[in-house]
A protein has these predicted regions:
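N-terminal, intrinsically disordered, polar/charged segments of Gram-positive cell-envelope systems
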Residues: 55-126, 235-245
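N-terminal glycine/threonine-rich, aromatic-flanked beta-hairpin/loop signature
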Residues: 250-286
Length: 337
């Protein structure tokens, strides 16, 4: 499938079952939706939210954040959150979560320790996910797990804005506003629309938002650590899977790169380049963040390079036929989600 972009909002498609003037033919749309729905089912079933494993789950490798270990002798072992969680899917836990986050912040001796200790809050509210029996209850549990990291993100931002000098604050504010504007579009790219996913949509949406909000919290914590003169190490991230965008310094996505496992467990990439087109294909992991990409129709080959928190790039090595891409062309995706 090859999609040609005339501009950022007007899309025409060529090579799809002779359906001129349509973005996607009906048959292709049904197949695409079915494939995506099955993939998302595998994604959710792989998460601890269904299995009772909590958020310390056996993640499929789509997640950018690798599992972290807590230092054996860390003082965070002394932190105990107040009150065991009472399971009530009609309860508003907003204030409870805020109090728990505040407790973590006040009892942590460094930002590094604070971010590690946040897992204690997640563990506390994972009992909601473990007790969930219906789709509605699963949706509620996912919302509160996302709220934990959203609360921590807001807490970090409050401290950043009061500590940074004027120029730093202005730069960070612009970046944060762009991230907020981008996250809805990035979520749509990764999980699809509400119409595609039906009653599962809130679960998929909040689970994905939890993941990228946690990642963003680490970014803000790193910036705050710089201001405070603290050492801060970013966690390991996948050298194969992730979502990367080029937003041209705005709140809109111009180009994007998504690398992931599909519902069959095969490695795939979706690459969208501003004013040129979108291609889908498979990749082979060469190690060290280098992925050899081949489009579905074989017309485009290239090398994806993933640089962790610093983004990714795609260099085209071969292009054939009517491909809008040219050999030697390279696209940067500097923002990692």
């Amino acid at each position: 499938m090859l999609i040609n972009f005339n501009d950022r909002h007007a899309i025409t498609v060529s090579g799809m079952n002779n359906c001129p003037g349509k973005a996607i033919c009906e048959g292709d749309l049904v197949l695409f939706t079915m494939k995506k729905t099955i993939y998302l089912l595998v994604l959710v079933l792989s998460m601890g939210i269904f299995t009772g494993c909590g958020k310390e789950n056996t993640e499929i490798e789509n997640s950018r954040m690798e599992q972290q270990t807590t230092p054996e002798n860390s003082e965070n072992d002394e932190i105990h959150l107040d009150d065991e969680l009472k399971i009530d899917f009609t309860c508003d836990y907003s204030e409870d979560i805020k109090k728990d986050v505040d407790d973590i912040v006040s009892h942590s001796t460094s930002l590094q320790e604070e971010l590690t200790n946040m897992e204690k809050v997640t563990q506390k509210y994972t009992s909601l996910a473990e007790a969930a029996q219906t789709q509605g209850e699963m949706n509620v549990a996912a919302h509160w797990l996302y709220t934990i990291w959203d609360t921590e993100l807001n807490n970090l931002w409050s401290r950043l804005s009061s500590s940074a000098d004027r120029q730093t604050k202005e730069n960070l504010l612009a970046e944060q506003r762009n991230w907020i504007d981008l996250k809805e579009e990035v979520t749509l790219l990764n999980i699809g629309s509400r119409e595609e996913n039906g009653s599962m949509y809130p679960l998929l949406q909040d689970s994905y938002l939890e993941e990228i909000t946690k990642n963003r919290a680490y970014v803000l914590a790193r910036e705050l650590a710089k201001i405070k003169g603290e050492d801060f190490a970013m966690p390991e991230v996948s050298a194969k899977y992730g979502t990367f965008v080029d937003n041209q310094g705005t709140g809109d996505i111009y180009s994007s790169l998504i690398t992931r496992q599909n519902w069959e467990g095969k490695d795939e990439a979706v690459i969208s380049v501003y004013r040129q087109g979108e291609i889908e294909g498979s990749f082979v992991d060469n190690g060290n963040g280098e992925l050899s990409f081949t489009s579905e129709d074989g017309s485009v080959k290239g090398m994806i390079k993933i640089d962790g928190w610093n983004g990714a790039s795609f260099k085209i090595t071969e292009a054939y036929g009517e491909s809008p891409f040219s050999a030697g062309e390279e696209v940067e995706f500097p923002l990692a989600f």
